[in-house]
Curated annotation (Swiss-Prot):
It comes from Saccharomyces paradoxus (Yeast). One of its GO terms (biological process) is regulation of nitrogen utilization. It holds the Pfam family GST_C. The lineage of its organism: Eukaryota, Fungi, Dikarya, Ascomycota, Saccharomycotina. The keyword NADP does not apply. Residues 210-359 form the GST C-terminal domain. GO terms for molecular function: transcription corepressor activity. This is Protein URE2. Residues 117-201 form the GST N-terminal domain. Homodimer. Residues 39-82 are annotated as: Disordered.
Length: 359
């Protein structure tokens, strides 16, 4: 998508571009947020109080009784709707557990013969959050195997997998070296990996030994998992998967993605300016005065990072989603040049290339 070196990144880009546009379920089996509009309708409390001006006390009492009845009816209706929805959800869960026709043998066999060490990553070929975890595993040099679940076979509903991730979504990770500890939610997995690496080696690779920096890394990581990924996911959903074409929804989520990128762009631009002013001392005065554009600095293409002066999970968490954002009509090279350079630096890393290829 964004490499000037020819086929290297254009090839690996295909690893994430196989988004299975025809599979409407693929957007609901990753750990991104999905808005449930079933509960968006609130109770209408605007009662008709015209009878309150009537001087007849009986009419006033009748009006109050009628209003009370309406409120009670509305509350009952909403309560019944919620109960019905919960019952439907329970029945769906039961139906999944009763699906005797679904072949779970591959998943069942794995859990019967689990490895004694390393990691097992459960992912999907179309799940950016799964590739996010693979990138960090690769960067840290951890030995891992990936099981790409087949959603069409319902493998994510296999009881053994649900025991790993009760949300029945990907990614999920098993740490075999910690008595087959299971971790789910991509952000939680990344934090587990960097903290374990730090504990085992004393090297805060992709992390930090400074509490202030750790807090900033967490902030950006949570920003990515709660704002960046879900908004791109929703924009993709309403553009490609939704049963109806709702232009306002596509526009709303695409605009929100642009807002999110604006936040990242500003942070990276501030770090770029600080870097150039620190390293390019002979031209710093000209940059400050505005007589020479900062873009002319030989340090203008040097990598900058969200936290501190090194790559962390705060940066890497964005990579797989940045690699598919053009599918919603956003050209980060033109609209967000610092985000583009930042992403390009990360996508050229051997561990990232390996992970995005699914190796």
């Amino acid at each position: 998508m964004m490499n000037n070196n020819g086929n290297q990144v254009s090839n690996l880009s295909n690893a994430l571009r196989q988004v299975n546009i025809g599979n409407r379920n693929s957007n609901t089996t990753t750990d991104q947020s999905n808005i449930n509009f079933e509960f968006s309708a609130g109770v209408n409390n605007n009662n008709n109080n015209s009878s309150s001006s009537n001087n007849n006390n009986n009419n006033n009492n009748n009006a109050q009784n009628n209003n009370s009845g309406r409120n009670g009816s509305q509350s009952n209706d909403n309560g019944n709707n919620i109960k019905d929805t919960l019952e439907q959800h329970r029945q769906q869960q039961q139906a999944f557990s009763d699906m005797s026709h679904v072949e779970y043998s591959r998943i069942t066999k794995f859990f019967q013969e689990q490895p004694l060490e390393g990691y097992t990553l459960f992912s999907h070929r179309s799940a950016p959050n799964g590739f996010k975890v693979a990138i960090v595993l690769s960067e840290l040099g951890f030995h891992y195997n990936t099981i790409f679940l087949d959603f069409n076979l319902g493998e994510h509903r296999a009881p053994e997998f649900v025991s790993v991730n009760p949300n029945a979504r990907v990614p999920a990770l098993i740490d075999h070296g910690m008595d087959n500890l299971s971790i789910w939610e991509s952000g939680a997995i990344l934090l587990h990996l960097v903290n374990k690496y730090y504990k085992e080696t004393g090297n805060p690779l992709l992390w930090s030994d400074d509490l202030a920096d750790q807090s900033q890394i967490n902030a950006w990581l949570f920003f990515q998992t709660s704002g960046h990924a879900p908004m791109i996911g929703q924009a993709l959903h309403f553009r490609y998967f939704h049963s109806q074409k709702i232009a306002s929804a596509v526009e709303r989520y695409t605009d929100e993605v642009r807002r999110v990128y604006g936040v990242v762009e500003m942070a990276l631009a501030e770090r770029r300016e600080a870097l150039v002013m620190e390293l390019d001392t002979e031209n710093a005065a000209a940059y400050s005065a505005g007589t020479t554009p900062m873009s002319q600095s030989r340090f203008f293409d040097y990598p900058v990072w969200l936290v501190g002066d090194k790559l962390t999970i705060a940066d890497l968490a964005f990579v797989p989603w940045n690699n598919v954002v053009d599918r919603i009509g956003i050209n980060i090279k033109i609209e967000f040049p610092e985000v583009y350079k930042w992403t390009k630096h990360m996508m050229r890393r051997p561990a990232v290339i390996k992970a995005l290829r699914g190796e």
